[in-house]
A protein has these predicted regions:
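A generic structural micro-environment signature
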Residues: 17, 25, 59, 77-78
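Non-catalytic surface loops within mature trypsin-like serine protease
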Residues: 11-13, 54-55, 82-83
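Short amphipathic alpha-helical segments
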Residues: 11-36, 64-67
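N-terminal processing/targeting junctions
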Residues: 2, 26-28, 54-58
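Glycine-rich beta-strand-turn "strand-cap" elements at beta-sheet edges
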Residues: 1, 35-48, 64-84
Length: 84
């Protein structure tokens, strides 16, 4: 089964590049490498990371942590999806 983990955060205004770099570094430093990963950006300094895993939906998988509170405007949003 294939599982996708999504992680989305919004940087403090003007710090989107810093959040993007932070997310890229943390994705590459995960304890176990995902099958695939993508890092995307959007207006309002938002960053989205999607990782794909060959695992059960409820598997214990490594996830990106919360960034420092001074880098983001709110708590990270997280979603987990399975292949339909």
């Amino acid at each position: 089964m294939s599982v996708a983990l999504m992680w989305e955060a919004r940087a403090v205004a003007g710090r989107g590049d810093e959040l993007l770099a932070w997310a890229r570094e943390r994705t590459l430093a995960l304890a176990v490498a995902p099958l695939r990963h993508e890092t995307l950006r959007a207006p309002q300094d938002r960053v989205l990371v999607i990782t794909w895993w060959d695992a059960a939906y409820d598997a214990d998988l490594p996830e990106l942590p919360e960034p420092d509170p001074d880098l983001v405007t709110r708590a990270v949003h997280r979603w987990r999806f399975e292949t339909a």
